[in-house]
Amino acid sequence: MSGNVASRFTDFRTSDGEKAWRHRDNEFEPATLTRAQLLQQWESAWAVMFREITALADDALSETVTIRGQAFRIDEALLRSLAHSAYHVGQIVYIAKAIRAADWQCLSIPKGMSEEYDRTASRENAAAHAAWLASRNQGSRGV
């Protein structure tokens, strides 16, 4: 994902989103990275994206950018990137759940806890929600 995000958002208003330096096919080859290296790649790519998005004015959303030679309005390109990233994050979560099995900690409301959660006022307060999830994840495998 980091290669895609970095490529798409580096100079994304002035150059094609598919950069020659990306070497996309190499991203699908097995690689051994430390956790620190992986996080560095991840954070670096997202920093590029956030820098570019932060610089956008509302009226720029209707401007056009190019991705693989195809023109997209900026708002369309952002939604396209969001959908693409969500797809891959889903894959990552699915694999992580399979690897961690019983040690998986739910990222939201654990399975079987919806009714209890709905009865609490914690859902109205972000800090209370986080505390509720943390307390439930201590003894729950979740989903």
Feature roles, as predicted:
Residues 74-112:
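A contiguous, mid-protein "functional segment" used to position or interact
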Residues 2-52, 59-65, 98-143:
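Short, helix-capping/interhelical loops that line the mouth of catalytic, cofactor-
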